[in-house]
Design a protein with these regions (language model features):
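A nucleotide- and high-energy phosphate-metabolite-utilizing enzyme signature
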Residues: 2-334
Length: 334
């Protein structure tokens, strides 16, 4: 008999609400403990090998790989849905769904390396945005970043196209970009949305050396950026988003993701914390004492982000010397 989320909290050293902040790691821990099974990657690799061991045409091999991948995706999603209906733990679902897609993409990249192009990928395939954060709802977009080598070849582009067309043919909604490390840094400096997405990137497959270079270069770049510009941009973005959804926390039918006090407000607090305090992980935000209400294990009594913003705005003052002279009053306090 499986334990409910609340029962699990009683036997875990890490509070349930903290585990929910890192669903990808939560599910990884469950995998290592043998408590959850998503995709048998070894069996997937063996079945792919069988496809390419025959004398089929390349077109037939691709069709067989696509068919196999569809079966794995469908079976995996059905298992995740059954687990959600049984345990009622949304954090486990979004983390497990992200890992399912990780493993599916990893299998496709391996197939391309071993059988289609017969060479290792020279790019790093990174998950970014919410997928990079390890949270993938049933109909969420899959945001991918192909970090290309500085001197890329035509074969690199063909490799990328093979992966993308396989994912599209699987019916997945994929957002993607292909840039070198230096192009990513330049784009982050020009576009706050790209910069935000890179805060949550992680490597799925491909060239480890390229992914490590991307991560270290971005981290070094952030270190020398004035935090004030990013903070102001994200708060302005939040104000515009609130205005689009009525600008009130008392809506009869609130948008729980983008409305005032919704999930995106919490994401914004973490993004600002990670950028301004140069932190790699959401748990580092709690460890640094930035969001003290969260560290105590509860949100402010009001049904909005106002209390959180108040706590955060006080702490962020320490880094304003790098940008704006004073922290403006959060619009949630008006």
């Amino acid at each position: 008999m499986s334990l409910s989320p609340i029962q699990m909290e009683k036997v875990s050293a890490v509070p349930l609400w903290q585990r929910w902040l890192s669903p990808h790691e939560l599910v990884r821990d469950k995998q290592r403990a043998g408590k959850i099974h998503i995709l048998d990657t070894q069996l997937f690799a063996e079945e792919i090998s069988t496809i390419y061991s025959g004398k089929q045409t390349k077109s037939d091999q691709r069709a067989a790989l696509l068919s196999l991948s569809k079966v794995k995706l469908t079976e995996g999603r059905k298992a995740l849905e059954a687990g959600l209906m049984r345990d009622r733990d949304g954090a486990v679902y979004v983390g497990a769904h992200a890992i399912l897609i990780d493993q599916l993409i990893g299998g496709l990249v391996a197939a391309a390396e071993n059988y289609v192009f017969e060479t290792k990928a020279r790019f790093a395939l990174m998950a970014v945005g919410g997928y990079g954060r390890g949270e993938l709802a049933p109909l969420s977009d899959i945001d991918l970043l192909f970090v290309m080598p500085q001197r890329h070849k035509k074969s690199d582009a063909e490799f990328v196209e093979f992966i993308l067309y396989m994912l599209w043919d699987l019916g997945l909604v994929v957002g993607h970009a292909s840039r070198t490390v230096h192009q990513n840094i330049a784009a982050a400096g020009e576009d706050i949305t790209i910069c935000t997405s890179l805060l949550e990137m992680r490597c799925i497959a491909g060239a480890t050396a390229v992914s490590e270079q991307m991560l270290s270069t971005f981290k070094h770049w952030v270190t020398y950026q004035p935090a004030g510009h990013f903070v102001e941009a994200k708060l302005a973005e939040r104000d515009q988003r609130h205005a689009r959804f009525g600008g009130t926390r008392y809506a009869v039918e609130p948008n729980v993701k983008d409305g005032k006090g919704g999930l995106r407000d919490l994401h914004t607090l973490f993004w600002i914390s990670k950028y301004a305090y140069r932190l790699d992980h959401v748990r580092g935000v709690l460890g640094a004492g930035i969001l003290r209400h969260l560290k105590r294990g509860h949100l402010p009594p009001r049904n909005d982000s106002c209390g959180l913003c108040g706590v955060f705005c006080i702490n962020i003052m320490a880094v304003r010397m790098t940008g704006l002279p004073l922290m403006r009053k959060c619009s949630s306090h008006r």
